Regions:
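N-terminal segments that mediate ammonia production and transfer
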Residues: 1-180
Length: 180
């Protein structure tokens, strides 16, 4: 009863930038539902859930020298890491090790482009290191729910091993973007 929620979908399941633009428009129009601090630049956070855009991530991964394969043959994770570089690198390595132990192939990390200059001081002071990762679907695993179950287990095992990292999302179908 305190949160504003909006939903934008393409009923044909077509992934378009227009859908993202419409979702961001909802976020802007629900600004009155959000809490803000006295400086007026730091809110209590907002997020949008999107279908994974294979076209986008294929290009982004390729720019990093990563081959993610075909659509739904990989998962994308969204992470908020500690600002401390040592803790961040330690957590990243731990995630990679756990992925391997869970029978998954870790493909690589992508630093998410951000615009810290638009943040208020409070948000900037606590801004996490925002990264995405790519995890390959094992050949002996069906795409869809069976693969997402493996990603869920990976996420939960990692979360139990690391309290300095927030896993925003980890899926082969959807991704969550959050901001303040």
């Amino acid at each position: 009863d305190n949160c504003g929620i909006g939903a934008i979908v393409n009923i044909k399941g077509i992934k378009t930038h227009k859908t993202v633009e419409n979702a961001l428009s909802i976020v802007e129009n629900l600004e009155h539902r959000a809490g803000k601090d006295a400086e007026g630049k730091t809110g209590d956070g907002v997020g949008i859930l999107l279908q994974i855009s294979h076209k986008f991530f294929e290009k982004a991964a390729k720019n990093l020298g990563i081959n993610i394969g075909k659509e739904r043959e990989y998962g994308v994770g969204m992470f908020f890491f500690s600002q401390d570089e040592f803790k961040r690198k330690q957590a990243m390595k731990m995630f990679e090790i756990i992925a391997q132990k869970e029978g998954l192939e870790f493909l690589g990390w992508r630093k998410v482009p951000t615009r810290p200059e638009v943040l208020g001081k409070k948000a900037l002071d606590v801004m996490p290191g925002i990264y995405q990762c790519f995890v390959k679907k094992p050949e002996d695993c069906e795409e869809g729910l069976p693969f997402d179950r493996k990603l869920y287990i990976l996420r939960k095992v990692f979360e139990q091993s690391n309290e300095d990292t927030y896993v925003v999302s980890l899926s082969s179908r959807t991704i969550v973007y959050k901001g303040m």
